[in-house]
Amino acid sequence: MNPKQLNNSYQKTKDDFQHYIDNVKRNSPWDIYTIINPTLIKNPYASELPKRFFLNDAGQVNNTVVFIKNLFKFYLKNTYLLVSYLMAFAIYKLYYKKRVRDELKIIIDTFSLVDNVNKNGEFNENYLTGIYELFEKYNTNYAILLRPCQFAKNPFKLRHFFKIISQDKRDFIFEYELLKLSDFFTLLSLMLLYPFKTLRLLQKEVSKEDKIFNHSLLADIKYFSFDSLTRYILGKHLSKIDSIEKIFSWSEFQVIERSFNYAIRKNSQKIELKALQFFLNYEVYFNSYVDDLDDDMLSAPHEVFVNGRYYIQNREKV
């Protein structure tokens, strides 16, 4: 299929694609395993489903073979990430002694590339430019919930990172501060169960769309995000802090945002989640669009702030 044919196929079947996924979501268990499933999230860069659906490609490999192959890769990769995360926790405890000065009320949830901070000698991200100055202008206290990124291959680079952040005058909070030893056993348990919980989503193969979905579902096990579980546990901890009123998050509504939202909304009725989508979006970046069904499943934020009127969606609940 050439690009023109692919585009024609997309235009003809894009509504069918959305309806199919929504139907699967409605009839699935609404728990963390469903919330973080990459096939249902429809990220074209982290799922085989969008491309296969529009190419009408059900795959040639037996689904059992696909599952076993990805199961082995899944456990190998995520065991490594769990060990790396445990090391990051230990490094945090050793090298980060700064504590939040003010009571946690407003949190700005964003991420930072560890290498960039280490190179520049300061935290200065370009995604939420202006929001810090806005809060400071109106004398509104805030804390930055910082997600260190791209350190898994070498957690020891976090030593310098934490030393740099310690020198910043602003309040910072890291997920490691809230972690307990039992959380690592929870992580391990969720991780071990995830591939088998995925099998609950397999559809009875009545149509070719069902075959495409099932093949993609099993192949997408390799796209599982370990961070989706750590963010889920973080959300549960934050939901228990009574002083928190609002959390502003940079959001592409990917799996890490969904699991975080789900944990907070399931366990707290008073924390307001504000998603900030200050980027140029495009139609086929399917995962970034928040639906009313996502709100029903508690994986959506309460409000989404977008980059202009063009991006405002006709939703009833979000």
Give the ranges of each region predicted by the language model.
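Catalytic-core helical/loop segments in enzymes performing group transfer/polymerization on anionic/lipid-linked
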Residues: 1-318
